[in-house]
Amino acid sequence: MSTTTLTRREQRAKAQHFIDTLEGTAFPNSKRIYVTGSQHDIRVPMREIQLSPTLIGGSKDNPQFEENEAVPVYDTSGPYGDPEVAINVQQGLAKLRQPWIDARNDSEELDDRSSAYTRERLADDGLDDLRFTGLLTPKRAKAGKCVTQLHYARKGIVTPEMEFIAIRENMGRERIRSEVLRHQHPGMNFGARLPENITPEFVRDEVAAGRAIIPANINHPESEPMIIGRNFLVKVNANIGNSAVTSSIEEEVEKLVWSTRWGADTVMDLSTGRYIHETREWILRNSPVPIGTVPIYQALEKVNGIAEDLTWEAFRDTLLEQAEQGVDYFTIHAGVLLRYVPMTAKRLTGIVSRGGSIMAKWCLSHHKENFLFEHFREICEICAAYDVSLSLGDGLRPGSIQDANDEAQFSELHTLGELTKIAWEYDVQVMIEGPGHVPMHMIQRNMTEELESCHEAPFYTLGPLTTDIAPGYDHFTSGIGAAMIGWFGCAMLCYVTPKEHLGLPNKEDVKQGLITYKIAAHAADLAKGHPGAQIRDNAMSKARFEFRWEDQFNLALDPFTARAYHDETLPQESGKVAHFCSMCGPKFCSMKISQEVRDYAAAQAIEVGMADMSENFRAKGGEIYLKREEV
């Protein structure tokens, strides 16, 4: 039954069943491996795709094979991708980073929650059935201390998180010996610095320079360290979250697990409905990837959805609430200034950012400057105490290609650059959010402007969508722009699902969006020339040429769909070993013909070689034995 035909009760029951029966699961013919670091507790997970051998000759009774190396790939699924790990959503994930956080001895447990709203929720017995049972006691920096990865990097410290990331970014490519797999075209990197081998010191230096961030709140010890930066692999974010009209805690946890399985490097919880606090707790305690939020959404819920009633005090309380739960990065729309709002009046689609429109409405109704801008230093102080990274929101991003690259968009971007420098004064990590809707020929300017205006802080974009004519297919229209801007230097791409502009995505939409954006990110890595990026492509091409169908399925980003499409027309097991597919059939398969041409050429070379030897034999007088000096 399609998810869209289920009732709300049935959807919740289905999600609950998914959670109750959840166990660590590997992709087909893959296994979880761990690469260890200098410390015994630095164990970096990767997925290793096992491949079948290549038939190279012999006879039917005595075939000869050549082994194909297993291909290691980056894995975001955390414990959910390890069949050896017992999963219990009620208890949450293991606290991977807790020993590292404790060993630094610069944070302390709080006697009570700092947020009045959190204290109110915890005191409400009516929420007991919804509440995650194993609540953590939150930590914050000790007085006079800073606990951010940027602070450590500037002090010259290589943290365990940085070593973990260095191993992870190398993707196990040092294991690959085959020259065929290691071959890679030189890329065009537009000034990015892409070392052949990523070291912990390189990670530290990039973070120290502000060119990369490690979103890792000390209250989210379950997360596996990852990095967002121009000189690393392009990352992908997935958005989940309930709304006032649909979705439940069970469904959001299901979407979280599903997102990490299909390659989400980070997940943003954009919940705006009931039980935001409780939903977020379940998500954080079960997330192996960093979690981001837009705090203004929840702050607005606290004032009954009336933007004019927002206050700095309510917003500050929300920041404390979320920081102590473990949110790894906040999207803050502090660049929507009062003087920029009139610039949007001549736009075709005005202000399309939800956070941007909230702050614009507040500014106009009070005729005051954006309180997020006015209190930005206080925001930084809060972030520094928990190591919450800032994602400076593009509240004035274009919502149509007609509005792309206009005065409002770039005015805000320049302000975000000023705010970046302020955040760095507090050792707070920063990335910059970008558009939006931009036609292809105008995309590169966005990257250039961001690098110049925002001092090379990582760029994080929503697409951009390259045309406005394809509702229902905006994962395609935006995937084109995402691949381009990723190539130009964008560090993280926020996925767009087929439901963009139409409705709240379900589980299948999340998968479609992620696959599309993993393609875009990988295409960008190839174009940049990221070391090792081509290994999987080469393995796939070799498997394709050798008609190793099972390996083709297993090397695919989505093995299940690849297999299903093949089996629609060749469902028999014999189709998995056939030297053709249903598109061309046995007589017109280009790969099969190419193999025959190669075999013929090899045979011809042998014949030519034998003819040359024969001619040489005759030229030397037909002697069977030659004198020593003639040899």
UniProtKB/Swiss-Prot annotation:
Binding-site list for Zn(2+): H437, H501
Listed GO CC annotations: cytosol
UniProt catalytic activity: 5-amino-1-(5-phospho-beta-D-ribosyl)imidazole + S-adenosyl-L-methionine = 4-amino-2-methyl-5-(phosphooxymethyl)pyrimidine + CO + 5'-deoxyadenosine + formate + L-methionine + 3 H(+)
GO terms (BP aspect): thiamine biosynthetic process; thiamine diphosphate biosynthetic process
Keyword annotations of the record: 4Fe-4S, Iron, Iron-sulfur, Lyase, Metal-binding, S-adenosyl-L-methionine, Thiamine biosynthesis, Zinc
Cofactor: [4Fe-4S] cluster
UniProt cross-references to InterPro entries, sorted A to Z: ThiC, ThiC-associated_dom, ThiC/Bza_core_dom, ThiC/BzaA/B
Pathway(s) where this gene product acts: Cofactor biosynthesis; thiamine diphosphate biosynthesis
Chain positions recorded as substrate binding sites: N239, M268, Y297, H333, S353, R354, G355, D394, G395, L396, R397, E433, Y460
Keyword Cell membrane on entry: no
EC number(s) reported in the record: 4.1.99.17
UniProt binding sites for [4Fe-4S] cluster: C581, C584, C589
HAMAP family xrefs: ThiC (MF_00089)
Subunit structure: Homodimer.
Similarity comment: Belongs to the ThiC family.
Name assigned to this protein: Phosphomethylpyrimidine synthase
